[in-house]
């Protein structure tokens, strides 16, 4: 698993090392920022000025024996990476592209200056007198998840904040805007074709239904190819399009489709048969399709190299990790991972029926992400509530942090966030999370489902007794901070 690669020492242990250099105001003032990216240098200077009081000169080339902070592109490496290199009189921050270089600067600010970007309404820049940096060390990081998305308006509405948390600022990056998911009806609209050509659609119980396409009909293939070409022509900067089933389970069971599905051991057989043919016509593009509900079980045939499998965990219990409570999904995930390295996970981390109700899935977020990464998931889309919900800011932050580095400790993330975002009230918010998770565990087996209802937990973690206890924790949390403070408003919003 491509995770945190540390050549000599891990960041969290740097503060304990004796092999360090202390940079105070005077010694740091001797440094120059060297880079061709003036905007990034200005960003670094903003934080240095606010934290330690230093604003460094900026040059675009290394000159003489000056001490420097070098912000450097290294395009020789094709895979995403960034690195922090510390030597006698230099700090070099590298990335293989502009985004990864920015991420490297943010890593430096976070790990060595203590900067935190908790939400769009709170950035913490500690006032410090010195920076402790390691001597003669390199820290190299290659993210195992290359496209990280948390379905939260905090990231969608503020691309700068998304950058700092190292996630995308749109739900479907690089996708054709009008063909992202459930697209069959967009390529061959039922209202346009069904009356004259019912044979284009699914055969079930002797009748053609305008539900899904017949994937072995050659005319359907040609129309979809033409439609895909038209979509790409209109949205020429996009590199990905979804060619995927509509949101129902009424797939075609004609003799030809059924023969393929039986041979392949899954209705995904006819889907991959069809999508591979589309993909061959667009070798420089990525064709995304769904492994969802009836197509979740993998077939025998491998998807082509430019096919992206979007595997959806919609059926799974969120009270326990997938590898413990959703064995069928785990089996399908492992099956797909043997067929392709192009897997995009569509995961679910909220309850669609009531976004504001408590949804104690805290203990499953990290193990589920770890499971996805271990099975070739290079893209992960965590479908959160998008709009404000229970502990919205914390959930957005925590999922982003774990997508960037799945090795992080979620309890440490929660403590860091609650202390920083809620001030002295944070300890009570953290206690609430701990307690509701404990009460869920006591109620097991309990199926925590995205289409469930809070009323199902009224005898368990949402019992009157438990609700009273949780309420008292928030009363204590509010009482611990000034009513006029931002902390108070954030606790009320939690």
For each feature predicted by the language model, list its residue ranges.
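Acidic, His- and aromatic-enriched active-site or binding-groove loops in soluble protein domains
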Residues: 261-278, 305-323, 403-409
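Structured mid-domain segments that build the active-site/substrate or prosthetic-cofactor binding neighborhood
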Residues: 219-220, 230, 328-424, 431
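Feature activates predominantly on carbohydrate-active enzymes
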Residues: 23-25, 30, 35-43, 47, ...
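Catalytic domains of carbohydrate-active enzymes that cleave complex glycans
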Residues: 59-61, 403-494
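Short, well-ordered secondary-structure micro-motifs within conserved domains or adaptor modules
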Residues: 48, 56-82, 152
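Glycoside hydrolase catalytic-domain groove-lining segments
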Residues: 298-306, 311-351
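Substrate-binding cleft/loops of secretory-pathway carbohydrate-active enzymes
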Residues: 288-315, 356-364, 389-396
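Sec-dependent N-terminal signal peptides
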Residues: 4-14
């Amino acid at each position: 698993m491509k995770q945190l690669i540390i050549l000599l020492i891990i960041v969290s242990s740097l503060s304990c090392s004796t092999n360090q250099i202390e940079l105070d105001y005077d010694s740091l003032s001797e440094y120059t920022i060297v880079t061709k990216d003036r905007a990034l240098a200005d960003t670094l200077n903003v934080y240095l000025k606010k934290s330690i009081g230093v604003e460094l000169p900026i040059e675009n080339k290394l000159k003489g024996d000056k001490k420097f902070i070098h912000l450097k592109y290294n395009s020789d490496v094709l895979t995403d990476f960034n690195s922090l290199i510390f030597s006698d009189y230099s700090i070099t921050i590298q990335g293989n592209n502009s985004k990864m270089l920015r991420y490297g600067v943010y890593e430096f600010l976070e790990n060595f200056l203590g900067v935190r970007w908790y939400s769009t309404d709170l950035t913490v820049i500690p006032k410090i007198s010195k920076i402790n940096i390691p001597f003669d060390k390199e820290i190299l990081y290659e993210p195992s998840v290359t496209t990280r998305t948390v379905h939260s308006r905090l990231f969608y509405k503020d691309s700068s904040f998304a950058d700092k948390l190292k996630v995308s600022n749109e739900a479907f990056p690089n996708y054709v805007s009008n063909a992202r998911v459930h697209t069959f009806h967009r390529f061959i609209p039922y209202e346009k074709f069904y009356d004259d050509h019912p044979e284009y659609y699914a055969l079930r119980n002797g009748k053609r239904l305008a539900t899904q396409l017949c994937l072995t009909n050659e005319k359907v293939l040609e129309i979809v190819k033409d439609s895909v070409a038209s979509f790409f022509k209109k949205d020429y900067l996009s590199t990905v399009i979804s060619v995927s089933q509509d949101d129902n389970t009424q797939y075609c069971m004609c003799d030809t489709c059924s023969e393929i599905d039986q041979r392949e051991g899954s209705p995904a057989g006819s889907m991959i048969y069809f999508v591979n043919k589309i993909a061959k016509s667009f070798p420089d593009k990525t064709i995304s399709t769904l492994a969802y509900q009836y197509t979740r079980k993998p077939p025998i045939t491998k998807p082509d190299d430019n096919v992206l499998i979007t595997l959806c965990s919609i059926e799974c219990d969120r009270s326990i990790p997938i590898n413990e409570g959703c064995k069928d999904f785990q089996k399908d995930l492992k099956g797909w991972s043997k067929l392709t390295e192009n897997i995009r996970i569509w995961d679910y981390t909220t309850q669609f029926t009531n976004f504001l109700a408590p949804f104690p899935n805290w203990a499953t977020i990290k193990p589920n992400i770890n499971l996805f990464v271990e099975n070739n998931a290079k893209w992960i889309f965590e479908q959160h509530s998008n709009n404000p919900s229970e502990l919205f800011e914390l959930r957005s932050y925590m999922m982003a942090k774990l997508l960037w580095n799945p090795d992080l400790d979620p309890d440490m993330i929660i403590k860091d966030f609650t202390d920083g975002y809620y001030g002295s009230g944070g300890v009570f918010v953290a206690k609430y999370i701990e307690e509701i998770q404990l009460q869920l565990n006591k109620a097991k087996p309990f199926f925590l489902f995205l289409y469930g209802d809070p009323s199902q937990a009224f005898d368990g973690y949402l019992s009157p007794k438990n609700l009273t206890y949780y309420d008292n924790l928030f009363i204590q949390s509010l009482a611990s901070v000034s009513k006029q403070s931002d902390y108070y408003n954030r606790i009320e919003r939690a």
